[in-house]
Design a protein with these regions (language model features):
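Hydrophobic alpha-helical segments, chiefly the membrane-spanning helices
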Residues: 288-294
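Generic leucine side-chain signal with a strong bias for well-ordered alpha-helical environments
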Residues: 237, 285-287
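Hard-cation-handling environments
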Residues: 226-278
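Hydrophobic packing residues within well-ordered alpha-helices of enzyme cores
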Residues: 40, 287-288
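Hydrophobic transmembrane alpha-helices and their helix-loop junctions in integral membrane proteins
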Residues: 1-232, 241-243, 249
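Conserved small/polar residues in nucleotide/adenosyl-binding loops
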Residues: 276-283, 294
Length: 294
């Protein structure tokens, strides 16, 4: 709970975002804070022997996903909003672990690493552009000055909210559907509500930063529309955008239908025939997307 910043031990993670943005992207979004998720998944045979602990994990994850999404809504520091978003997404993974959906937890861990790292790096690009200003109430109108960062942030945001075809759609919706299917009504409803909070705080950042009015001093506003940040800052955005959008599409089969984790995780009900029928509608969408790309 502490390592993956779950309620009530989540307070350390937003404060750790005071460091450099690349550190936030690499460690706090993709690796370090997910160690707790990996540990529970790796020890899944042991946790399967303790039903009470699994139910506790399920409710902790659901509460974290919803509660921290609400906290993100009232933040104005761009990095803190993304930090609370990270905790909320870790709640999805924790809830999946509590429902014995270990493959789905690892699925979301993988997809989340890419689009959340992209969001952090886009935030860093924005902060540099705005002379280290992080308050989104003072930042605005960057769409015409930072077109590459704008597009990268948009794709990462779509994946975060679970827009169809993006990586986040496959991993998040799979977790929510599976938890609802197996009868966990209260966690299911909390995760559904967290979708709305995720959409709200993501839209808050996106439209305020790229379409709002800037209140920065005139000497800090850059009126040159061609002045994007250096190539060294833009290259990682290109690298992370593709997996943020398409990764879920290509690893859906080995994780959801295949047996990638059969020797390491105690995956049980995920591959039942009844659950396969439940997922038929999403599998059909998955096949349509594959055909469109091919």
């Amino acid at each position: 709970m502490a390592k993956s910043a779950q309620v009530p031990l989540q307070f350390w993670l937003p404060d750790s975002m005071e460091g450099p943005t690349p550190i936030s992207a690499l460690i706090h979004a993709a690796t370090m804070v997910t160690a707790g998720i990996y540990m529970v998944a790796r020890l899944s045979p042991l946790y399967e022997l303790t039903d009470g602990v699994l139910i506790f994990i399920l409710y902790v994850g659901s509460i974290t996903a919803f509660f921290l999404g609400l906290v993100a809504l009232v933040q104005n520091d761009i990095k803190r909003i993304i930090a609370y978003s990270t905790i909320s997404q870790l709640g999805y993974m924790t809830a999946a672990l509590g429902a014995s959906l270990y493959s789905l937890a690892m699925f979301h861990l993988i997809t989340h690493a890419f689009f959340k790292a992209l969001l952090f790096l886009c935030a860093g690009s924005i902060i540099i552009k705005c002379h280290h200003e992080q308050d989104i109430r003072k930042i605005g109108g960057l769409r015409k000055y930072m077109p590459i960062t704008y597009l990268a942030f948009m794709y990462a945001s779509l994946s975060l909210i679970g827009f169809p075809i993006t990586s986040g759609f496959y991993s998040k919706e799979s977790i929510i559907d599976a938890i609802g299917y197996f009868g966990h009504t209260i966690p299911y409803l909390m995760l559904l509500l967290s979708i709305f909070t995720t959409t709200l705080y993501t839209s808050k950042i996106f439209f305020k930063v790229f379409f709002g009015e800037s209140t920065l001093p005139k000497e800090e506003q850059n009126d040159n529309p061609k002045n994007e940040n250096d190539r060294q800052m833009l290259l990682p955005l290109f690298v992370l955008t593709a997996p943020s959008v398409f990764l879920g599409l290509f690893i859906y089969d080995p994780l959801m239908i295949g047996i990638l984790f059969q020797n390491s995780l105690a995956a049980n009900e995920l591959m039942t025939v009844s659950y396969t029928h439940l997922r038929a509608h999403e599998t059909s969408l998955h096949l349509v997307c594959r055909l469109l790309l091919e």
